[in-house]
Amino acid sequence: MFDWVGLLLKVLYYYGQIIGLINFEIDWQRGRVVAAQRGILFAIAINVLICMVLLLQISKKFNLDVYFGRANQLHQYVIIVMVSLRMASGISAILNRWRQRAQLMRLVECVLRLFLKKPHVKQMSRWAILVKFSVGVVSNFLQMAISMESLDRLGFNEFVGMASDFWMSAIINMAISQHYLVILFVRAYYHLLKTEVRQAIHESQMLSEIYPRRAAFMTKCCYLADRIDNIAKLQNQLQSIVTQLNQVFGIQGIMVYGGYYIFSVATTYITYSLAINGIEELHLSVRAAALVFSWFLFYYTSAILNLFVMLKLFDDHKEMERILEERTLFTSALDVRLEQSFESIQLQLIRNPLKIEVLDIFTITRSSSAAMIGSIITNSIFLIQYDMEYF
């Protein structure tokens, strides 16, 4: 059967190399990460080219009317902040990949080893991977279409600026997609662990009803204890992957979340400006407006996918804790070693709760996400009020 999921993952890998985000090579057959000289030199060449393009853009005057045919001063400030933050996010992602290259290589190798251990995990996540891939592709094509729409207003400086802006967007989107795929992989493994825990508890429940106890009973208890210990070991590995992911993507995470925040406020303000002034007042064509709002839709769809997969992982972790609590319903005591194995994995989950943190500044939860949305709404209102008063 054709492995289209594996093909998509390899396309993402090579795309990451082409845009300069991945600076190592992967041996897919052996599940190894290789620091090949060819990959290093290619990444250096791409990164140097990016820096040259950015320096060329900074040294030249850029006409902000390529975004709106007629923009007031507040529009220009908003655009400058958005573009500057995107450039800073892209550069920080590239620099961080070199600074934490060894740690990232260990993380990828750890993920690949578990991935090859149970290849059907890939099939469990196939539709989520396809949706994320499709949203990313459509988003990139829409951004290219928006750039093509403004070709008649582009000089050389503006063309370089739009090209570098697109390149930085591609790097940021790819970094976010990599984070998404790792979390998705961990969540798929959690589904397997929950199934195994349920089976072990069910078999233990059946054993607890057996009396008198014989040698076969003790053998079965030892077998179940080994299974629980293996589950605990694998859960610890998965949590270690999430911890390493927090460390590797820390700086990128704060830049991306800052970008989502600023971009959401700016999007609300621009939508207000278009609703009040009309697209003709801003010298924006109907097709350009349709492309922009279509891109907004896919941009936020991607953000929602990223958020939901993290929140669902928290739910899976909590559900695993709840499943383990069912062992207290056994009708009689089990073997001491099996009881200790159950207690050990429960203590492991309680003592080391799952967290997805952004640079140790805040933890991603439903409450923190709701607070961020509330803050976005508040600051969007402030920006609109400022526009109403002074422009």
UniProtKB/Swiss-Prot annotation:
UniProt name for this protein: Putative gustatory receptor 36a
Pfam family, one: 7tm_7
Cytoplasmic topological domain residue ranges: 1-3, 60-73, 148-165, 269-290
Biological classification of the source: Eukaryota, Metazoa, Ecdysozoa, Arthropoda, Hexapoda
Subcellular location: Cell membrane
Protein family according to the UniProt entry: Belongs to the insect chemoreceptor superfamily. Gustatory receptor (GR) family. Gr22e subfamily.
Gene responsible for this protein: Gr36a
Recorded topology in the membrane: Multi-pass membrane protein
Any one GO molecular function term: ligand-gated monoatomic ion channel activity
InterPro entries: 7TM_chemorcpt
Function: Probable gustatory receptor which mediates acceptance or avoidance behavior, depending on its substrates.
TM spans (from-to): 4-24, 39-59, 74-94, 127-147, 166-186, 248-268, 291-311
GO CC annotations on file: axon; dendrite; membrane; neuronal cell body; plasma membrane
Organism: Drosophila melanogaster
Keyword set, alphabetical order: Cell membrane, Membrane, Receptor, Transducer, Transmembrane, Transmembrane helix
Extracellular side: 25-38, 95-126, 187-247, 312-391
Any single biological process term in GO: monoatomic ion transmembrane transport
